[in-house]
Structures are given as C-alpha cells and as structure tokens.
Amino acid sequence: MTWETVIGLEIHVQLNTKSKIFSGASTAFGAEPNAHAGVVECALPGVLPVMNREVVEKAIKLGLALDAKINRKNVFDRKNYFYPDLPKGYQISQLDLPIVEHGKLEIVVGDDVKTINVTRAHMEEDAGKSVHEGLNGATGIDLNRAGTPLLEVVSEPEMRSAAEAVAYAKALHSLVTWLNICDGNMAEGSFRVDANVSVRPKGQAEFGTRREIKNLNSFRFLEQAINYEAEAQIEILEDGGKVQQATMLFDPEKGETRVMRLKEDAHDYRYFPDPDLLPVIISDDRLQKAKAEMPELPKEMAARFVADYGVSDYDARLLTASRVQAAYFEEAAKESGQGKLTANWMNGELAATLNKEGMELADSPITAPRLAALVGKIADGTLSSKLAKKAFEAMWAEPEASIAEIIEKHGLQQMTDTGAIEAMVDEVLANNAKAVEQFKSGNEKALNAIVGQVMKASKGKANPAQVQELIKAKLA
C-alpha cells in the first residue's frame, strides 16, 4: 500500500515588543530567573491585564502580509489548565475570534511553487518554563517568559512531505523577520513549531489520526521529526494497530518521537471569554494606517528585481530571503550597474564563503560597495572570472584594501597586450598539434583544451574570450 503523509503546522511567533502582552514587564531574553516576572504573570490578587497596543499592530501587519482577513472585533478567552509555570491557572488566548483568518503563504520546493492556506493567527500570552538543571533533583519555575506576546499561526493540513513543511516554516520565518515583528531566533524560542502529522492510504479523502509533535526549534529537527513520526505511524497501521491521538516530543539525540501525553481536545480546556479584558476593536482608520505603513514584501521585491535588474526568478527569491540580503544586493547592483553579475557573485562565491566561515552577511568584510567595485572590474574586462576569484579571496583577507590596491598588490590585472597573447597562442598551437587536428575535425572540446593551455601559460591573466577568438581565427 502507498501511504500519504498529511501535515499541518502551528507556529508560535514571539513578537519583539519591549513589554509583555498584558503588563509592563520586560520581555528581554537572558535575565536572571524571575527578574522579569510581573505582577500579572505572577497572578497576584487584584491585578488586571492591560492590552499592549503594539501586539495588535504587529498582528495586523502579519495579516496584511498573508493577504488575510483582519477581524475588526477581537475577544480574548481563558484557556484553563494546571501547570506549575502558569500561576493564573489559565492562559489568555483567542478561540472563536482570532485577529487573522483565511490567509495564504507561497512556498517553493525544488521547481514547484505551492500555496499553503493559513487558517488563522491569534494573539496569546506565552507560559513560563520549568527549570530542572542544577537544582539537585528539584524543579524551579522561571516566569520571565510568561506573558511574552505570541502569535500562533495555524496552517491548513495541506503539506504532504517534510520538505514542504520545512519550506512553509522557512517562508513564514522569513516573512516575520522581514516585517520586523519577530527576531526569528529559534535557539531562544522566538519561533517554535508544532507539527501535526497523520498518514492515510494514497487517494483516501478522510484524514488519519494525527499526532502533534511539540516545540521543534530548528528546521532540521522539524524535518527529522516529521519523517520519523510518519514512518512510525505507517509501521503501526501496517502491523494492524491503531494510531492514538497524542502529544509527542522529539528527542534530537535519538532522532525519534515519543509520547508525552494523550492529546486533549479544545473542550478539555474549558475555554470561556476573559471577563477582565474588553474586546479590541480595529477601526477603519487604524487598518488604513497599517496598510500605508506596510513595507515592500519579499514577493513584490523579487518581481521588481527580475524586472529592473534582469536576474532570474530563482536568484530573486534567494536575494529576498531577508531584508539585509535584499538591501545589500540593491546597493551593489545600483553602484555597479550589473544586476545579473552581482546576483551571481552574491548567490555564488559570497554565499559559499559566508557559509564556510559561519558568518552572517551583515558581518561580511566584503561590503556592498566593495562587491560592486569587484563586479565593475569584471564587467570592464580588468579582471577575468578566474582572477576575480583571487581578488575576492584577497579582499576577504584585506578588508581595508580597495579593489585597485588588491589588483596592483597581487598582480591580478588581465592582460591587454594583444601581441603578447597572440605569441602565447602561436606557441600553444605549435606544441599541441593533436588537439589542433581534433578541433579541425569538428571536436569542440579540443578548443577548450587549447584555450586552457593558453590560460595556463598566461597564469590566468589572458581574457578567455579573446584567446578563443584568436585561436578560431588562426585555425579557420
């Protein structure tokens, strides 16, 4: 039997506000335990929650970017459950009236473009966390994270592979960081993924029983967890068993999922409207203001890069993966006047070097103006592609040096003396009679071999196109 995996994601996006969603306590990461535990988060008697306006603004911004419906009336609900890191005994969330509904997000997997529908995004508060390390077998409670504003973004179960789920998560991560509503730091818990996974026979309309894998904080873990869970469910079904609805944890060391608890449904949480919070009404003026303040979105910018700079759709998607990358490209392309060549170098040599060095683009010793200068020297014929790579390496190692200084210091200028190049061509032709005969017999590969010999003789400084023209002229 052929099985199909069905995946839906619930992603917790931690909003980068300075204060918490219902109190003025700080959201700064890394403080001493409970240093930012406010009176609301501690559930002290008589304290009341006060809505953080900025949370609403950021939620609207995401809704607009997802081309979603923005609900004008927002009601908060209490989600009741007992856990030590939740002193109130309930979490303030949104059940029936989320701020964002019916959005969509485009993903790319290989050569395929697919649109995933976003069911909803609702505002809620984060819980605290339990601390087990260094307490001699006891458990401590840290409420610094409690009350931190979250947007829980829920997709439709429309992904059919771990690769599609990762592409969706990456696309949403890119979007929320682009909008500057989340810092995207997965290691610090700013972007956490819950994956709902089920399997069914290929062609069956009815969904299988889903299991939810909680708190995946890297794209690699997301992929591993989904693949393992899908295989585990298939094995259960093929052995004649039944998959039980459950909440799962992923063990990254073993690369496997395990049951944390049997899954609860919404009625288990006894939701009811929070009597301490008035509905949040979004006016026409507020919505129009939010629309006017929206930045150019990645998809729009990618289309502009294709139109204005002549880059491919693929390159444009890479260049708009982040605002930093897009701004770098646009600055370098404008300065050099060479959009396509700039894109090739950014997505090629520069990206590879950054990856090798474990660096971010913002920290690159080759700034946008320096890359523009390098690209300009390639475009005007001063540097061949081979010499340009050597120049790039030198520029990386010597961040203060100009491209002119690099070329002079390392002797990288391309040969322009036609007479000297012609003499090298004559010598190579004389010493490679076999290759010459092969080329005359129609073997195009022989031409590449001859060009290679001339380039070797010139130590890479001859212009390959010029060399090829000279060889063809002499052998015509």
Curated annotation (Swiss-Prot):
**Cross-referenced Pfam families, in alphabetical order?**
GatB_N, GatB_Yqey
The EC number(s) this enzyme carries: 6.3.5.-
- Domain of life, per the record? Bacteria
Supply one GO molecular-function term: glutaminyl-tRNA synthase (glutamine-hydrolyzing) activity
A biological process term (GO) from this entry: glutaminyl-tRNAGln biosynthesis via transamidation
Summary of the function given for this chain in its UniProt record: Allows the formation of correctly charged Asn-tRNA(Asn) or Gln-tRNA(Gln) through the transamidation of misacylated Asp-tRNA(Asn) or Glu-tRNA(Gln) in organisms which lack either or both of asparaginyl-tRNA or glutaminyl-tRNA synthetases. The reaction takes place in the presence of glutamine and ATP through an activated phospho-Asp-tRNA(Asn) or phospho-Glu-tRNA(Gln).
HAMAP family linked? GatB
Protein family (similarity comment) = Belongs to the GatB/GatE family. GatB subfamily.
This protein is called: Aspartyl/glutamyl-tRNA(Asn/Gln) amidotransferase subunit B
Organism whose genome encodes this protein:
Neisseria meningitidis serogroup A / serotype 4A (strain DSM 15465 / Z2491)
